[in-house]
């Protein structure tokens, strides 16, 4: 086999391999994009809150050591008072941590109020 023929064959085989690799990579990119879009829909609510600088429900639950799924008003108030007093700056605590505890309490309280509103039946309004 002559040298020009070998070089030509090398170029043809190399371009075939590269084109197959690009096609395969493109298919993988499409599959990843489709999979990512379904995951993003689920996480969009919490990521929107984070972008706005708000605390997420999971973060608030972590701060007060409460599972958001088993949220009760009495337990929330008890944990809030305990953590708020522990972090009192007059007792050697941190104002920053105390404010985080306060914001966590606000977030979980609003979530609890929202759950209560959803569970209570809507009262019909009647006009006389």
UniProtKB/Swiss-Prot annotation:
Predominant place of localization = mitochondrion
Bilayer topology reads: Peripheral membrane protein
Question: Which GO biological-process labels does this protein carry?
Answer: protein import into mitochondrial matrix
Q: Which domain of life is it from?
A: Eukaryota
- One of this protein's Pfam families, by short name? Pam16
Q: Cite the GO molecular-function annotations of the record.
A: ATP hydrolysis activity; protein-transporting ATPase activity
| Keywords from the named record | Membrane, Mitochondrion, Mitochondrion inner membrane, Protein transport, Translocation, Transport
Q: Residue spans with biased composition (Polar residues)?
A: 117-128
Residue numbers spanned by region J-like: 59-113
Instruction: Cite the residue spans of the region called Disordered.
Output: 108-128
Alphabetical GO CC annotations of the entry are: mitochondrion; PAM complex, Tim23 associated import motor; TIM23 mitochondrial import inner membrane translocase complex
Q: Does the keyword Membrane apply?
A: yes
Q: What function does the entry list?
A: Essential component of the PAM complex, a complex required for the translocation of transit peptide-containing proteins from the inner membrane into the mitochondrial matrix in an ATP-dependent manner. In the complex, it is required to regulate activity of mtHSP70 (ssc1) via its interaction with PAM18/TIM14. May act by positioning pam18/tim14 in juxtaposition to mtHSP70 at the translocon to maximize ATPase stimulation.
Q: What's the subunit arrangement here? A: Heterodimer with pam18. Component of the PAM complex, at least composed of mtHsp70, mge1, tim44, pam16, pam17 and pam18.
**UniProt record similarity statement:** Belongs to the TIM16/PAM16 family.
The domain comment in this protein's record states: The J-like region, although related to the J domain does not stimulate ATPase activity of mtHSP70. It nevertheless mediates the heterodimerization with the J domain of PAM18 and is therefore essential for PAM complex function.
Name of protein: Mitochondrial import inner membrane translocase subunit tim16
Origin organism of this chain?
Schizosaccharomyces pombe (strain 972 / ATCC 24843)
What gene name is given for the protein in this entry?
A: pam16
């Amino acid at each position: 086999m002559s040298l020009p023929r070998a070089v030509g064959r090398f170029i043809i085989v190399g371009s075939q391999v590269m084109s197959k690799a690009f096609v395969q990579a493109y298919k993988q990119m499409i599959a990843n994009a489709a999979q990512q879009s379904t995951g993003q829909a689920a996480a969009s609510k919490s990521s929107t809150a984070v972008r706005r600088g708000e605390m997420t429900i999971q973060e608030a639950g972590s701060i007060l050591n409460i599972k958001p799924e088993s949220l009760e008003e009495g337990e929330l108030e008890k944990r809030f008072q305990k953590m708020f007093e522990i972090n009192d700056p007059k007792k050697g605590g941190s104002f920053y941590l105390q404010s985080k505890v306060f914001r966590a309490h606000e977030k979980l309280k609003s979530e609890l109020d929202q759950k209560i509103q959803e569970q209570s039946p809507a009262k019909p309004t009647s006009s006389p």
